[in-house]
């Protein structure tokens, strides 16, 4: 019973870390990466379609992205979708290929992004602590129903706290890595 609760909490904490990493990849650093455009949707024959289904995104170098659109008539729609996204990118088309130069981030913009990243990381920590709280309340209800002893209850709370500490440390490591990426010129 206790092991199931702990295992479930570990799974949920792992998913929280993955969700944090996913949300941080959407924050633009000075480097080009294809996942930067993952959330962009293009109107394709009346339907909203993810950009990666309309064209192929590649990274020719650290400061540029390029998109090869499968249907050449969609180039202007793809450009509009990129401009509408609030990434601050200006696509340039040569008829068959869309190039997106990534302007270097200003110092002020970097600091703003670091604040955003810290907020995301704090949200990840809060999610992990909420999972710990849920597990602890499950342990308390088991104790009230006399399904576990007082000693088992304390051991379970200690082990869930140790697991929580490990995951919070992982959040801190992800945060430090992303901050370093942002402050790199």
Swiss-Prot record:
InterPro entries assigned to the protein according to its UniProt record, in alphabetical order: Ribosome_recyc_fac (IPR002661), Ribosome_recyc_fac_dom (IPR023584), RRF_sf (IPR036191)
A matching Pfam family: RRF
One biological process term in Gene Ontology: cytoplasmic translational termination
Subcellular location: Cytoplasm
GO molecular function: ribosomal large subunit binding
Top-level taxon of the source organism: Bacteria
Disulfide bonds: none
Location (main, coarse): cytoplasm
Keywords per UniProt: Cytoplasm, Protein biosynthesis
One of the record's GO cellular component terms: cytosol
UniProt cross-references to SUPFAM superfamilies, sorted A to Z: Ribosome recycling factor, RRF
Its biological purpose: Responsible for the release of ribosomes from messenger RNA at the termination of protein biosynthesis. May increase the efficiency of translation by recycling ribosomes from one round of translation to another.
Family: Belongs to the RRF family.
Protein's name according to its UniProt entry: Ribosome-recycling factor
Species, as recorded: Colwellia psychrerythraea (strain 34H / ATCC BAA-681) (Vibrio psychroerythus)
């Amino acid at each position: 019973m206790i092991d199931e609760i702990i295992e479930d909490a570990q799974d949920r904490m792992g998913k929280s870390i993955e969700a944090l990493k996913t949300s941080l990849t959407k924050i633009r650093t000075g480097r080009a990466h294809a996942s930067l455009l993952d959330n962009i949707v293009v109107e394709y024959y009346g339907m909203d379609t993810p950009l990666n289904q309309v064209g192929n995104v590649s990274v020719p170098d650290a400061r540029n992205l390029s998109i090869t659109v499968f249907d050449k008539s969609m180039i202007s729609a793809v450009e509009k979708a990129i401009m509408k996204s609030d990434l601050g990118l200006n696509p340039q088309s040569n008829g068959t290929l869309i190039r997106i130069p990534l302007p270097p981030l200003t110092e002020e913009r970097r600091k703003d992004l670091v604040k955003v990243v810290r907020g995301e990381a704090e949200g990840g920590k809060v999610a992990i602590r909420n999972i710990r709280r849920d597990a602890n309340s499950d342990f308390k209800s088991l104790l009230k129903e006399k399904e576990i002893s007082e000693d088992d209850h304390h051991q379970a709370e200690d082990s869930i706290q140790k697991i929580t500490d490990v995951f919070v440390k992982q959040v801190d490591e992800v945060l430090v890595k992303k901050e370093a990426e942002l402050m790199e010129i």
